[in-house]
Amino acid sequence: LTFPRKGDTPRIREYAITGKLQRQFLNGNNSKIRADGFVTAGNVTGTATEEFITSFGQGVEPRVRVFNRAGVQLRSFLAFPSAYRGGVVHATGDVDGDGVEEIIVGTATGTAQVRVFSGTGKLIRQFFAFTKQYTGGIRLAIADVDGDGSNEILASKFSKDPRVAIFSGSGIFIR
Protein backbone atom coordinates (compact mmCIF):
# COMPACT_ATOMS: atom_id res chain seq x y z
CA LEU A 1 0.00 0.00 0.00
CA THR A 2 1.25 3.46 -0.82
CA PHE A 3 0.12 7.01 -0.14
CA PRO A 4 1.67 9.75 -2.30
CA ARG A 5 4.05 12.35 -1.01
CA LYS A 6 2.99 15.93 -0.45
CA GLY A 7 2.13 17.67 -3.73
CA ASP A 8 0.68 14.65 -5.55
CA THR A 9 -2.94 13.59 -6.05
CA PRO A 10 -4.10 11.65 -2.94
CA ARG A 11 -4.33 8.30 -4.71
CA ILE A 12 -4.03 5.10 -2.68
CA ARG A 13 -2.29 2.28 -4.52
CA GLU A 14 -2.10 -1.40 -3.67
CA TYR A 15 0.68 -3.47 -5.21
CA ALA A 16 1.22 -7.23 -5.35
CA ILE A 17 4.45 -8.61 -3.91
CA THR A 18 5.73 -8.74 -7.50
CA GLY A 19 5.34 -4.97 -7.78
CA LYS A 20 2.32 -5.12 -10.08
CA LEU A 21 -0.36 -2.51 -9.39
CA GLN A 22 -3.51 -4.27 -8.16
CA ARG A 23 -5.85 -1.32 -7.61
CA GLN A 24 -5.90 2.41 -6.96
CA PHE A 25 -8.44 4.96 -5.78
CA LEU A 26 -8.70 8.51 -4.44
CA ASN A 27 -8.53 9.11 -0.70
CA GLY A 28 -11.90 10.81 -0.37
CA ASN A 29 -13.61 12.89 -3.00
CA ASN A 30 -11.23 15.84 -3.26
CA SER A 31 -8.46 15.25 -5.78
CA LYS A 32 -7.16 18.80 -5.17
CA ILE A 33 -5.75 17.99 -1.71
CA ARG A 34 -1.97 17.81 -1.96
CA ALA A 35 -0.98 16.79 1.58
CA ASP A 36 1.02 13.73 2.47
CA GLY A 37 -0.71 11.00 4.41
CA PHE A 38 -0.82 7.53 5.86
CA VAL A 39 -2.47 4.27 4.83
CA THR A 40 -2.74 0.93 6.62
CA ALA A 41 -4.70 -2.27 6.13
CA GLY A 42 -6.72 -3.78 8.94
CA ASN A 43 -9.94 -5.61 9.63
CA VAL A 44 -11.82 -2.87 11.47
CA THR A 45 -15.32 -3.94 10.37
CA GLY A 46 -15.17 -7.56 11.52
CA THR A 47 -15.71 -8.93 8.01
CA ALA A 48 -13.63 -11.61 6.30
CA THR A 49 -11.38 -9.09 4.52
CA GLU A 50 -9.16 -6.22 5.55
CA GLU A 51 -10.07 -2.62 4.84
CA PHE A 52 -7.80 0.30 3.95
CA ILE A 53 -7.59 3.05 6.56
CA THR A 54 -6.26 6.49 5.59
CA SER A 55 -5.44 9.83 7.18
CA PHE A 56 -3.75 13.00 5.96
CA GLY A 57 -0.66 14.79 7.21
CA GLN A 58 -0.39 18.49 8.02
CA GLY A 59 -2.64 21.15 6.55
CA VAL A 60 -5.85 19.13 6.15
CA GLU A 61 -8.77 18.44 8.48
CA PRO A 62 -8.06 15.45 10.77
CA ARG A 63 -10.32 12.98 8.99
CA VAL A 64 -9.86 9.21 9.02
CA ARG A 65 -11.43 7.20 6.21
CA VAL A 66 -12.13 3.48 5.91
CA PHE A 67 -12.36 1.94 2.43
CA ASN A 68 -13.20 -1.57 1.29
CA ARG A 69 -10.83 -3.42 -1.03
CA ALA A 70 -12.61 -1.99 -4.08
CA GLY A 71 -11.92 1.58 -2.91
CA VAL A 72 -15.48 2.32 -1.78
CA GLN A 73 -15.52 4.54 1.29
CA LEU A 74 -17.30 2.77 4.15
CA ARG A 75 -16.75 5.25 6.97
CA SER A 76 -15.33 8.67 7.65
CA PHE A 77 -14.84 10.46 10.97
CA LEU A 78 -12.87 13.28 12.55
CA ALA A 79 -10.05 11.95 14.73
CA PHE A 80 -9.53 15.33 16.44
CA PRO A 81 -11.41 18.67 16.45
CA SER A 82 -11.78 20.04 12.92
CA ALA A 83 -9.57 23.07 13.70
CA TYR A 84 -6.55 20.78 14.27
CA ARG A 85 -4.43 20.75 11.10
CA GLY A 86 -1.26 19.11 12.41
CA GLY A 87 -1.75 15.75 10.72
CA VAL A 88 -3.04 12.38 11.90
CA VAL A 89 -0.93 9.23 12.18
CA HIS A 90 -2.67 5.92 12.75
CA ALA A 91 -2.27 2.20 13.26
CA THR A 92 -4.74 -0.67 13.43
CA GLY A 93 -4.89 -3.64 15.74
CA ASP A 94 -7.13 -5.47 18.16
CA VAL A 95 -6.27 -3.75 21.44
CA ASP A 96 -9.36 -4.77 23.41
CA GLY A 97 -9.36 -8.51 22.67
CA ASP A 98 -12.75 -8.67 20.93
CA GLY A 99 -11.36 -10.07 17.66
CA VAL A 100 -11.99 -6.87 15.67
CA GLU A 101 -9.23 -4.34 15.10
CA GLU A 102 -9.50 -0.80 16.39
CA ILE A 103 -8.16 2.37 14.75
CA ILE A 104 -5.56 4.04 16.94
CA VAL A 105 -4.73 7.63 15.98
CA GLY A 106 -2.15 10.11 17.15
CA THR A 107 -1.14 13.68 16.52
CA ALA A 108 1.58 13.98 13.87
CA THR A 109 2.57 17.34 15.37
CA GLY A 110 1.72 19.02 18.63
CA THR A 111 0.99 17.29 21.93
CA ALA A 112 1.31 13.51 21.94
CA GLN A 113 -2.39 12.70 22.05
CA VAL A 114 -3.58 9.15 21.34
CA ARG A 115 -7.17 8.19 20.63
CA VAL A 116 -8.64 4.73 20.16
CA PHE A 117 -11.68 4.38 17.88
CA SER A 118 -13.88 1.45 16.99
CA GLY A 119 -14.16 0.54 13.32
CA THR A 120 -17.39 2.55 13.24
CA GLY A 121 -15.56 5.71 14.29
CA LYS A 122 -16.80 5.73 17.90
CA LEU A 123 -14.25 7.15 20.35
CA ILE A 124 -13.39 4.47 22.91
CA ARG A 125 -10.61 6.17 24.89
CA GLN A 126 -7.95 8.85 24.73
CA PHE A 127 -4.72 9.65 26.56
CA PHE A 128 -1.41 11.45 26.20
CA ALA A 129 1.60 9.28 25.35
CA PHE A 130 4.07 11.81 26.76
CA THR A 131 3.83 14.95 28.88
CA LYS A 132 1.70 17.78 27.55
CA GLN A 133 4.87 19.86 27.31
CA TYR A 134 6.15 17.64 24.49
CA THR A 135 4.84 19.04 21.18
CA GLY A 136 6.80 17.15 18.52
CA GLY A 137 4.14 14.66 17.45
CA ILE A 138 4.24 10.88 17.60
CA ARG A 139 4.28 7.71 15.53
CA LEU A 140 2.29 4.60 16.47
CA ALA A 141 2.54 0.83 16.25
CA ILE A 142 0.53 -2.08 17.64
CA ALA A 143 2.19 -5.29 18.84
CA ASP A 144 2.12 -7.92 21.57
CA VAL A 145 5.45 -6.85 23.05
CA ASP A 146 5.24 -8.83 26.29
CA GLY A 147 4.00 -12.13 24.83
CA ASP A 148 0.80 -12.28 26.88
CA GLY A 149 -1.47 -12.65 23.84
CA SER A 150 -2.80 -9.07 24.01
CA ASN A 151 -1.69 -6.21 21.78
CA GLU A 152 -0.13 -3.10 23.24
CA ILE A 153 -0.03 0.44 21.85
CA LEU A 154 3.47 1.75 21.16
CA ALA A 155 4.06 5.48 20.77
CA SER A 156 7.39 6.97 19.78
CA LYS A 157 8.35 10.60 19.76
CA PHE A 158 8.83 12.10 16.32
CA SER A 159 12.14 13.64 17.35
CA LYS A 160 15.76 12.75 18.05
CA ASP A 161 14.68 11.31 21.41
CA PRO A 162 14.48 7.52 20.84
CA ARG A 163 11.98 6.98 23.64
CA VAL A 164 9.07 4.59 23.06
CA ALA A 165 6.14 4.47 25.47
CA ILE A 166 4.14 1.25 25.77
CA PHE A 167 0.49 1.23 26.83
CA SER A 168 -2.06 -1.50 27.38
CA GLY A 169 -5.05 -1.53 25.06
CA SER A 170 -6.96 0.33 27.75
CA GLY A 171 -4.41 3.16 27.69
CA ILE A 172 -2.57 2.27 30.92
CA PHE A 173 1.14 3.09 30.82
CA ILE A 174 3.28 -0.07 30.99
CA ARG A 175 6.79 1.32 30.39
Predicted region positions:
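Beta-propeller blade termini
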Residues: 1, 37-45, 50-54, 88-95, ...
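Short glycine/acidic-enriched loop and turn motifs that connect beta-strands
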Residues: 5-9, 57-61, 109-111, 158-161
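A short loop-to-beta-strand structural motif that recurs across blades of beta-propeller domains
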Residues: 11-13, 63-65, 113-115, 163-165
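Extended intrinsically disordered, low-complexity coil regions enriched in Ser, Thr, Gly, Ala
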Residues: 15, 27, 68, 78, ...
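Short loop/turn segments that connect beta-strands within beta-propeller blades
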Residues: 16-20, 68-72, 118-122, 168-172
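Repeat-based blade/solenoid architectures
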Residues: 24-41, 78-91, 128-141
